[in-house]
Amino acid sequence: MVLAIMANAVCICMAQDNIVRMLPENGATEVNIDTHLTLIMSDDVTIGQKGFVSVYDKQTGKLVDRLDMSIPAGPTESQPKNPAAQYTPVPYIYKSQPITNRNTKAGTPSGVNAWDTRRYQLDIIGGFSDGFHFYPMITKGKQVTIYLHHNMLEYGHEYYVTIDKGVISGFNGIKSKKGWSFRTKEKAPDKSQRLLTVSVDGKGDFSTVQGAMDFIPDSINSAQEGYKVLVKNGDYEELVYFRNKRFVTIEGESREGVVIHYRNNEVFNPHPAEIKTNEVRGTFPSRRAAFAADNCSDLTFRNLTIRTDYKGQAEGLLVNGERNFFENIHIIGDGDALQANGSCYWQNCRIDGGGDTILGRGPSFFNHCTITSYGAFMWIRNTAENHGNIFVDCHFKGRSDSAELGRLPNNNGKNYPHAECVLLNCTLENIPAFGWGEIDDSAKTATILEFNSHDTDGQSIDTSKRNPLMRQLDPIRDAELIGRYSDSHWVLGW
């Protein structure tokens, strides 16, 4: 017996000889159920392409979750364009039921789309059964973070983790039940607790933004029943997607201190090959944003940085819904950095993108915001049902000589004749003299208005070379119209 114990101890020691620290610590208690697993090693980490990371219930021995490292994270090349792709013939149904990895197979079609049979990592996030491709392990020098499938851990359970040899290059793995174990908190926060804290160090109610949003009930009826999620300063590398939420405030401790980001784009998480997404109300949801609030209304976001870490069609933030308010938010993306479908108010926000930086159906009211872009600042797609993008006292910074304010080119035979963009008292920096780029004949009925644009010294911009479809407003003749567009209630309807 003594020899067996000694042999087991030697095995554990050999398996862990290059681990400096585990998070959660081995034997930790009061661990959040949305925790990531982190190893800090003695040398820089290289991820292997074989083996399993497994989590077991320590009491029952039941396998709770498993990551197969032989499966690629997701696509690395764009899927072929399908000219036969259509918008869903019936509106997409946002079911309000607990769909998680524990009760549903990731990849289960949630709409009229077909099963995707390609072999990639899949994780149900925020009730989206089709799942998201994800990185099961992410390295930063000597640190490796393991991302379990969402919603697999439960309150009041003790778990142990095993890691096969080969999962991490040069690491013998963890084989013993005693090698890495932890116990989760005994119970969830009380449902009557309307203030939830997220802290990346595990000292809050949740360790991730996604964990907090998963906890909050769908479709809350009033502000009195609403929740506030306070996010402590930290680096939150997570793909965030939630749906059907109302009357929730997500507030960071500070804008620069709270960074929520992930490597996501249209290549990594594409729309179904046979289904078009985004543009038409009620169509199949997009999965390419780093952070998406889908079919959500009456939300408030404050003091956060939201960023995608990939190039391409890659939103930092995608929001679908009505009456959503954003204050002091920094959004960083590439093409389509911000996609906003539904009425949104943006106060003192910063938006940085690569081109078509602001996309969507609107309406959006931007007040004292700063927008930077390498290509066109916006591609507005509102219909006659609502206003488009209205900017009041905003600052546009061009990052290249081709950073025109917007464009309305022919879009595969379709255009946006009711598109609307209004600039009032805005600062323009390094913007081409013609202002707007291409406007196809099919969009010449668009409303593009400008009033009192000036440079960084406050001097009036020379608008004599503007695109002729970009109308300059007169302070006397158009005073009433300027007043209307300056009123967010008139623009947004609330």
Residue ranges, per PLM feature:
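Sequence-level preference for short, compositionally simple segments enriched
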Residues: 187-494
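Short N-terminal micro-motifs specific to bacterial/archaeal maturation
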Residues: 6, 28, 150, 155, ...
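Acidic, low-complexity Ser/Thr/Gly/Pro-rich repeat segments typical of extracellular/periplasmic
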Residues: 16-189
